[in-house]
């Protein structure tokens, strides 16, 4: 009897450890948001150029990359093209030594999705010194640009605005 219980227990243990094949979860979905990443795409190179122009306080030099009817968001605040151009230029009224890559390289790539959209995405650490607070500021940033015909038609910037808002309040 002991041998029978041992045999049944052993079989249950062995078969309970065998993975169950589940085609729904093991199938790779080749859906709309699947696609290919390319860190050497033209859009990646243009985004690098844009980020360099920003850090050099020469953002208007890349104005040609931005669609006239761009939808631009800084967190949940929406801006038009001129709002974006003048807004980022105002950073230099508030901060010195602005950099996108002082402490670490920029992570940047472009995704060509199966639904036909093209997005460049960057993750980086923005740094600067407050002109009013004198604080050394470091902000983690993610931005994504959707491209059509060589122009940015959507732009999303995500970051914690606390240090920026603090510097604005000290400037006033």
Regions found by a protein language model. Name each.
Residues 4-14:
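Sec-dependent N-terminal signal peptides
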Residues 17-56, 64:
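Short, low-complexity N-terminal intrinsically disordered segments enriched in polar/charged residues
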Residues 26, 153-172:
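Low-complexity, intrinsically disordered terminal/linker segments enriched in charged
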Residues 35, 132-137, 163-170:
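A short acidic/glycine-rich loop-to-helix N-cap element
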Residues 58-112, 118:
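A solvent-exposed, acidic/Ser-Thr-rich amphipathic alpha-helical stretch
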Residues 111-118, 146-153:
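A short, structured loop/turn motif at beta-sheet edges
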Residues 123-152:
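Exposed beta-sheet edge and beta->alpha loop/turn motif
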């Amino acid at each position: 009897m002991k041998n029978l219980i041992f045999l049944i227990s052993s079989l249950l243990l062995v078969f309970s450890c065998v993975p169950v094949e589940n085609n729904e979860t093991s199938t790779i979905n080749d859906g709309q948001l699947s696609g290919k990443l390319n860190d050497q795409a033209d859009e990646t190179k243009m985004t690098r150029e844009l980020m360099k122009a920003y850090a050099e306080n020469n953002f208007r030099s890349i104005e040609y990359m931005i669609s006239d009817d761009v939808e631009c968001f800084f967190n949940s605040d929406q801006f038009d093209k001129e709002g974006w151009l003048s807004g980022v230029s105002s950073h230099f009224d508030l901060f010195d030594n602005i950099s996108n890559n002082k402490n670490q390289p920029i992570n940047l790539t472009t995704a060509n999705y199966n639904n036909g959209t093209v997005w460049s995405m960057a993750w980086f650490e923005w740094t600067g010194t407050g002109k009013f607070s004198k604080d050394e500021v470091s902000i983690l940033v993610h931005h994504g640009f959707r491209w059509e015909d060589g122009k940015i038609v959507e732009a999303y910037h995500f970051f914690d605005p606390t240090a920026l808002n603090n510097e604005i309040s000290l400037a006033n």
